[in-house]
Amino acid sequence: MQPQLLLLLLLPLNFPVILTRELLCGGSPEPCANGGTCLRLSRGQGICQCAPGFLGETCQFPDPCRDTQLCKNGGSCQALLPTPPSSRSPTSPLTPHFSCTCPSGFTGDRCQTHLEELCPPSFCSNGGHCYVQASGRPQCSCEPGWTGEQCQLRDFCSANPCANGGVCLATYPQIQCRCPPGFEGHTCERDINECFLEPGPCPQGTSCHNTLGSYQCLCPVGQEGPQCKLRKGACPPGSCLNGGTCQLVPEGHSTFHLCLCPPGFTGLDCEMNPDDCVRHQCQNGATCLDGLDTYTCLCPKTWKGWDCSEDIDECEARGPPRCRNGGTCQNTAGSFHCVCVSGWGGAGCEENLDDCAAATCAPGSTCIDRVGSFSCLCPPGRTGLLCHLEDMCLSQPCHVNAQCSTNPLTGSTLCICQPGYSGSTCHQDLDECQMAQQGPSPCEHGGSCINTPGSFNCLCLPGYTGSRCEADHNECLSQPCHPGSTCLDLLATFHCLCPPGLEGRLCEVEVNECTSNPCLNQAACHDLLNGFQCLCLPGFTGARCEKDMDECSSTPCANGGRCRDQPGAFYCECLPGFEGPHCEKEVDECLSDPCPVGASCLDLPGAFFCLCRPGFTGQLCEVPLCTPNMCQPGQQCQGQEHRAPCLCPDGSPGCVPAEDNCPCHHGHCQRSLCVCDEGWTGPECETELGGCISTPCAHGGTCHPQPSGYNCTCPAGYMGLTCSEEVTACHSGPCLNGGSCSIRPEGYSCTCLPSHTGRHCQTAVDHCVSASCLNGGTCVNKPGTFFCLCATGFQGLHCEEKTNPSCADSPCRNKATCQDTPRGARCLCSPGYTGSSCQTLIDLCARKPCPHTARCLQSGPSFQCLCLQGWTGALCDFPLSCQKAAMSQGIEISGLCQNGGLCIDTGSSYFCRCPPGFQGKLCQDNVNPCEPNPCHHGSTCVPQPSGYVCQCAPGYEGQNCSKVLDACQSQPCHNHGTCTSRPGGFHCACPPGFVGLRCEGDVDECLDRPCHPSGTAACHSLANAFYCQCLPGHTGQRCEVEMDLCQSQPCSNGGSCEITTGPPPGFTCHCPKGFEGPTCSHKALSCGIHHCHNGGLCLPSPKPGSPPLCACLSGFGGPDCLTPPAPPGCGPPSPCLHNGTCTETPGLGNPGFQCTCPPDSPGPRCQRPGASGCEGRGGDGTCDAGCSGPGGDWDGGDCSLGVPDPWKGCPPHSQCWLLFRDGRCHPQCDSEECLFDGYDCEIPLTCIPAYDQYCRDHFHNGHCEKGCNNAECGWDGGDCRPEGEDSEGRPSLALLVVLRPPALDQQLLALARVLSLTLRVGLWVRKDSEGRNMVFPYPGTRAKEELSGARDSSSWERQAPPTQPLGKETESLGAGFVVVMGVDLSRCGPEHPASRCPWDSGLLLRFLAAMAAVGALEPLLPGPLLAAHPQAGTRPSANQLPWPILCSPVVGVLLLALGALLVLQLIRRRRREHGALWLPPGFIRRPQTQQAPHRRRPPLGEDNIGLKALKPEAEVDEDGVAMCSGPEEGEAEETASASRCQLWPLNSGCGELPQAAMLTPPQECESEVLDVDTCGPDGVTPLMSAVFCGGVQSTTGASPQRLGLGNLEPWEPLLDRGACPQAHTVGTGETPLHLAARFSRPTAARRLLEAGANPNQPDRAGRTPLHTAVAADAREVCQLLLASRQTTVDARTEDGTTPLMLAARLAVEDLVEELIAARADVGARDKRGKTALHWAAAVNNARAARSLLQAGADKDAQDSREQTPLFLAAREGAVEVAQLLLELGAARGLRDQAGLAPGDVARQRSHWDLLTLLEGAGPTTQEARAHARTTPGGGAAPRCRTLSAGARPRGGGACLQARTWSVDLGARGGKVYARCRSRSGSCGGPTTRGRRFSAGSRGRRGARASQDDWPRDWVALEACGSACSAPIPPPSLTPSPERGSPQVAWGLPVHQEIPLNSVVRNLN
C-alpha cells in the first residue's frame, strides 16, 4: 500500500480531521489555521489535521474541552461543533460548545451538584426515598402509609378505604371520601336511590328504576332517550314552544326528534318554565322572584347582595350619626345598636340619665348632675364625696405648708406633710442632716449639710452645684471659648478645644498663615481662618499662583496667526497681510501705491493686484504689451486691456490685417483678441476668477480659483470649505461603533451604545459573562444582547424549559422525515444519518464497501471509492473490460454476468445488460419494486411477487399511503379536550387542569403551591382540582382563613378564651381555680390535661394534692416524658448490674457494650444466675433479687409473675434472658420461643405526636377511632373490634395489681393502654353481663374462703377499698385488685407475618412475665403487678389464681410496719406556742411545719383511720409566690363553693364583724405556728386583706386596740411576722402593692416598699402597681412609686400600654405632668403603634396633649394604621386637641392605610366643625371649645378629674366624678342579683357598678333569663354587704381606642353600666 494512503487511514484514529470538498492544500494562505497541517488527498482535495486544542473544518475553533476543570467531579467533556440554522446570518458569530457526561451521583451542566446536596438523608421522613426531578427539585417517594411533600404525614388513604371510585382525602383525625355521583356514605359504600329524590330525576309520566350508581327512566311507548325526551317521527311544525329548536336524532333504523329548549324552559315541548325559586339561596327573609333560568332575591332594607347575605352597615351609612352624644355605633346582623358612654341611655344614646335622681348627698348639700355621675356641692363645714363628713380642716390644725383633708373613712383630720416635716399635724421639722449620720449624706460629692426648717442646704465643694451637690458645675455654660471652638467641662475648670487656625487658652488668637510668604510670582497674600488666599497677577493661577496660565489655549490669534506663550502674557506671529495684537487687522498693501501711474491697485488678503491700464501687463504693470517688431509692416500695435493686437490703420494701402485665429480657452477670438466668458480672464481666457474675488477663505486661508469655484488652503487649526471650522478633538472621529463624541475641557469623551464599552467604544460588551445558559446551552454574544443555543430537548431564553418536541418544532435534521407519535416526534432519517434527530453521520467507510483494496473516501452522507489500477465502477468492483474481468475471476466471459446477462465493453470498462426482472452490476439481484420507494409519508414498502404493498405510518392510508387519515374521528382526547388532526397523528388542546397527549393526565395543582403555607398541613391533588388539608385553627379553600376558635366558646367551667397567634394559631383557655385542661373541662390535679409526651401514660399521683405523674415509654424520661432516650451503649444508666464496669464497643449501628463483672455476677450483664441459700425461698411470694435468674427458676416465679421460666423452649446456649429488651437486636433471640428478643429487632412503634394525645383521651371510650386503631396507638382499647366479640370465649388475662381507689378508673385505662402498647395487642377491661367493669377487690387473707368456688361471680360486689393499703409501696395507699382484661389476638400469629406479637394467651403471659423478670414492667404501670393468669371466663376462681403473694406472712409484716409508721408519725408531730394574730374572716388557719419547702403528706390510711382530712398547702409558682390550691379532686362542688367563695353582706362594714371573727379563729392545734400567708378566697392573703381594709374605724366601737393591734396598722404585725409582700391573687395576679395602689393606700404602699415589695411586679394583664395607681388616680401612691429608684416608669402591659399612655387616656392630667417630670418616654408606642399623644387626641384630652407636645412628642407620629394624632382627633370629634395640633403645624395631608386624610374622616363622621377647622377657616380655640360642648358628635365634653375613695380634689373644685366599678348583675325572681364585689364606705373600697336587669329581661345571648341561668354564687343585690373579706373585684381595663373615650372598670367587663348613685340607693 502506498504510504500516503496508509497515512490517510491512520489519521482519523488519532487527530480531529475534517474533510471538505473545497479545501485545497498548497494555496496561499494555507487553509488550516492555528498550526493545523493540510494533508492532501487524491484529486486535489485536502483535509486539516488540527493541533491539540483546536477543531473545525480549518482548525478555526478553540477546543472548549481543553480546560480540564470544565466538567467537575470526574465528568467527561465532549466538544460540539456549531451547526447554524439555515435562517441564521452568515456573519453571526458561532463558537463550539461542550457537553458534560456526569458520573453516578452528580448532576448539573458541569456535574457540579452532588445529588446528596439536593436530597440530604433527612429530607424524606418515615423511610421515604428522595430523588431529583428533571427540573432539579427534590421529590420524595413515600412508603405506603405516608404522604406529604416530605412524607411527614400519615396517609390514611393508603389502604384505599373509599369504595365505588370514591376519592380519599386525608383529614385529621380520620379520612374523608369524596364520592362520585350516585354514591354516598363515609366510604361511598351506599348507592343513592335517585328515584327517591324530590323532585325525581325522570319526567312526569315515566317510571324511575334505580341502578348501581345511577338510574334509568322507563319511557312510555313512542319515547326514547335517558330522559324520555326523544319522540318517534319527524319534527311536526310548531312542536317546540318558547323558542325551542327541534332536532332529528337517528336511532338505529328509526328517526326520533327532541326539543332543545332555551335557558329557562323545560318539558318535552319546552312548555314549562321551572320555578327556580324552589332551591333558592335567598337569606335573611328575602323574597325570591322567579325568572328565566334564574331568580332574583328581593332583599329587606337591612341586607344586600345577590343572595341578601351581605349586611348593610347602618353605622357607615350617610346621614346623621345613628348614635348621639359620643355613643359608639356597632353594626349587627340586620340591625345595629349603640354603646352609650356613661351618663347617656336610650336606643340612640339620646337620653341623658339623671344621676341626681338617686343621689345620696347629705342634707343641705346640692347635687349636681354630671354625665355618667354626680357630685355633691357641700355647704360650709361639710366635706366628703356625699358631704356626709364634718370638715375637720376649718380649724387649720395642720402646718401652714401641709395639706389638710378630712379622712373620708374615719372623718378625722388627715395632714399630708410637705417634705421635711413630720408628725400628725406636720409641725415637727425633720433634721435631714442628723438622719444622714445613720446613712448616706443627702449632700453628694463631699458637700456639707446644713439643716433648715422643712429642708436642708448643701455647701458644695468647688466644681459642684445643685441642691444636693449632685451636679458637676458646667463652666462651659458661660461659653468662655472663642466661637467655633469646643468647650470641654472639667472638674472645677474647663478646657477649650481649638479648631485649626486658632490658638490660645480661649482659642482667641488667630494664626496668620501669610507670615511664611506662601504666594509666588509676586502675588498678594490674604490671611484667612486656618488658611490663606493668594491674589494672583494676570497670567498666573493656582492656589499659590505657581502656575503660568497658557494664554494660547484660548487661541487668541486670528487669521492663522501663531500664538507664542510667555510668562504672564502672549504674542501673535501674524501671517503676511495681517497685523495687530491678535492679527485681527488686514494689511492694505495698496496704501503704498505699488502700482504705476494709470494702474489701479486691488487689495487682496496678504497681497495686492494691479489692474493695468491698456497696453501694460505684469505684477506691477511694468511690461508693455506692444513690443518692437511685433506687427507686420504697415500694421500698428494697439495696446488694449490684457492684449495688444496689430491693426491696419484706416486708409493704409497695402496693409494686410491679422487673422482672427487667436487661441481663447474660455472665450472667442475677435479681431485677434480673446473675448473671455464671464468668470474667466487672461490673454487666452485661461484663468478662472471664480469666488476668489470675494475672498471667501477665512482665518488666513489661501484661495485657489478652480473651474467650478475655488479651493481654500487652510492654516493649522482650521478646516472646512472656507476654513471657518475650528479643528477639535472630535473631528478625527475617535469614538467607534456608533459612539457619540463630546468636547470636554480636558479633550473629549465618548458616550457608547449599550453594546460597546471602553474609552473609544472599542470593546464589545460580552453579555455572556453575566448570562447563564442552562442545561448545556451555549451562550452567543450579540451587539447589545445575547442568545442561548439550547441543547436538544430544551428551549427558552436560558434553555430552562424542557421541550417535548413535535414535528411542528422541526426537530429532525439532515432532510429527515418527521412523524408525530404519542411519545413525541420521531425522525425517519435519510440514508447516511442516524440518531434521535438524525444528527449523527454514519461512518459509511467503516463497513468497507470498496473491494479490491480500493480506498474509501466519505463525503457527507455518501462515500466514494478510489479504485486501484485495473478496476473501475462506483465500488471499484468492475475490471476495465469483460475479458480482463473474466480472466481475473477464472471464469468464462459468458459467466461474468449472472442470470443470463450479457457483458458489453464500453470504453475502458464494461457493464452487464440484464434480462428483464434482474438488476445489479452483475445482474445478481432481482428487481425490487420498492426502489425507488413508492410509499409516501415515511411508510414501509414490502416487496411482493406481483408488486409491492405499502405499510402506512399512523395517520395515513391509501395504496401509496398518500391519504391523510382524520385521527380525530375516534375522539382520542379525554376530559373534554379539543382534537386537531395533524399529519401522522392528532393534537389535543387540553382544558385547564389536564395535560398529556390525550389530556388524560390530571395536572398536579399542588406543584404551584396553591395552599396558604402557614395554615396547610398537606396539599392533595384531585381531578382538575386540589384539596388543602388545613392545620388546626385554619379553614378556607386554601387554608388562608384563621378561625376564631373562641367564637364557639370552647372553654368550659367559666374559663376565658384567648386567641393565640401560632403557628399554628389556636386558642388558650384561662381556667378558673380548680379546673385545667385545654378547655378547662378537667378538674385540677387530674390526668385530663397533663400531657405525657412520646407515648407516655398519665397516672394519678400517689400523693393526694400532688400533680399527676407520667409513665414514659420507649426509653423517654422526665416529668413529661420529654427527656430523650439514653444513647445506646453504656448509658447512663449503666446496663451492667451489681457494680459491673461497662465498656462501649463499636457496632454496625448504635454502639454496643461489654460488661466487666465481679466474680459473684458472671452473667453478660453481671446477673447472678443462681445463688447459694436460695433453697426454699422460691415461691414464698417475695422476689429475692439474688435468686432471680434461670438458675433459681426466677425465684420460683416470685420475680416473674408466677411463671417459673418465661424463656422455656428458648435454647439455653443463646442466653436470650440476658439480652431481653437491652435495646439491641440479637437475631438468635428473634423467635417465638425466645419472645421475639423483646421486640428489640423491630422498629420502635410510636404513636404520631399529633394523634397521641387524642388517642389517649379517646382510649376505650366505646367509639371506634380508626386513626388510633393500630399497634403504635394501642388498638384504641378494643373499640374497633366487631360487635359481640366480647364474649365468654374470648381470651382474657386476669391481673393482680395494686391500684389507688381515688383514681381507679383513670388507672385502669392507663393500665390497659400501657399493656396494649407494650405487648402490641388490644387490651381492655372486660365488662360483665350487667355492663360493669370486671374489677374485684382482692380479699387478701380471705383468699382460701372467698376463692374456693363457693361464691360465683354474681355474688361479688364492688366493695370499698380495703382498710389497709396493699402493695409494695406504703406511700401509694393502694389496694389489691383483680382486673380481668379482654385480649384481641386476631392480628397476631403466622397468618399475620407483618405483626409480630403474641398470638395465644400462654405466649402473652410469658412475654409479660419476662418483662417483669428483667424489671422492665414495673416502671410502666400505675401500680405493682403482682401476678397474672390467662382466663376465659368472667370471674377467676380460687384455684385459678396463682398468687399467694398477699396471703404470705410477708404481707402481715408489711402491714404491721405500716401501722407502726402511722403511730410514729402522729407521735413525732411537734407543737409550738404562738401569739394572737389578726386574720380576716374566711381565712382557714393551717399549721406551718418545719418542712416548708416540701409538701406535707396526709396521714397514711386517713380514709380508714377516720382522721380529718388536711387541706393541701399553697403551691408555689415559678416566681416563688404562694398560690392557693383548689378543692380536692372528688370534692363536691357545693362544698367547694361554700368554703372557697363565701359571700358577705354588703351592708356591714369591717368593724361590724363579730369580735370573734376579727380575732384569730380557733385552730385544730393551738400550739402550732401560724402560717401568715394562708390563702383565703381567690388566693387573698391576710396581708392583702389588711391593705384592702387598712385604716378602718369601726362604727360599733371596735377600735384597733380592741382588735389587739394597738396603734399599729393591720399590716404591720403581718409584715413583722414575715408575711410575703410578693404574693398575688389567683384570678388577677395582683400583689399587696397593687391593692395599695388600687385603693389609694399610700401608707401601706410606703410600708410595702420598705418591706421589699417589687414595684415592677406585673399582674395577669401585665399591669404594674404604677399602672394601677394611674388608673385609680392615686396620686400619693404614684409619687411614692416614682420616687423609688426601682420603679420602671415605662413599664408596659401585655398590649404595650405605659403608665403615661394610661394617664393620657384616662384624662388624669396631673399625673401626666408628674410622669413627664419623671422622664417617662413621651415617644413610646404600644403594640398598635400609638403614642400617648394618640390617646390624648382620641379622648380630647387637650391639657395632656399640650404637656406631651411641650415635652417633645411627635405631633405627626403615625401608628400601625398610619393614623396621626390629628387623624384620631378628627375621627373622634376632639376639637380642642385638633385646634392645638393645627396651631403647632400638624400635617393635615397625611393619610392612613385606607387613603383617608383627617378631613376625609371628619366628613365621614359628620364633624362639620372639625372639617371647617381642617379646611383652614376654623373658629378660634374658645369657639371650638364652646361648639364642642353643645354640638352632638362634635367631640367629648371636658372631663372632670376622677377620684378614688380616700382622695380629695386638689384645688377645692367641686367637679368630681365617682369612680365606677363593674359588678355582674342579673335578674331573677324580680330582684337584682350581683356577684358581690365591694363598695366604698368604711372599708374604703370602690362603689360597685354594673348591669341591671329587671325580672324576665333578656340575658347576654338574648334568651330569657331564668334562675338556672345565674351562677350559684350570685345573691340578691340588697343582700350584699361590704365585708372586707369578700373577694376583691378583679380589675379590667376596657379602653375603646377606636370610638369614644375609654372606660375603667374593675371586674368583669359588661355591656351596660349603672352609675354609683343607683347602687348606693339600692344599698340604702
UniProtKB/Swiss-Prot annotation:
Residues 1345-1369, 1516-1535, 1879-1907 are annotated as: Disordered. Residues 21-1443 are extracellular. LNR repeats lie at residues 1166-1209, 1210-1241, 1247-1287. InterPro entries: Ankyrin_rpt, Ankyrin_rpt-contain_sf, EGF-like_Ca-bd_dom, EGF-like_CS, EGF-like_dom, EGF-type_Asp/Asn_hydroxyl_site, EGF_Ca-bd_CS, Growth_fac_rcpt_cys_sf. Highly expressed in lung, moderately in heart kidney, and at lower levels in the ovary and skeletal muscle. A very low expression is seen in the brain, intestine, liver and testis. The chain crosses the membrane at residues 1444-1464. It is a single-pass type I membrane protein. ANK repeats lie at residues 1628-1657, 1661-1691, 1695-1724, 1728-1757, 1761-1790. Residues 1-20 form the signal peptide. Residues 1465-1964 are cytoplasmic. It is linked to Loss of the extracellular domain causes constitutive activation of the Notch protein, which leads to hyperproliferation of glandular epithelial tissues and development of mammary carcinomas. This is Neurogenic locus notch homolog protein 4. It comes from Mus musculus. The lineage of its organism: Eukaryota, Metazoa, Chordata, Craniata, Vertebrata.
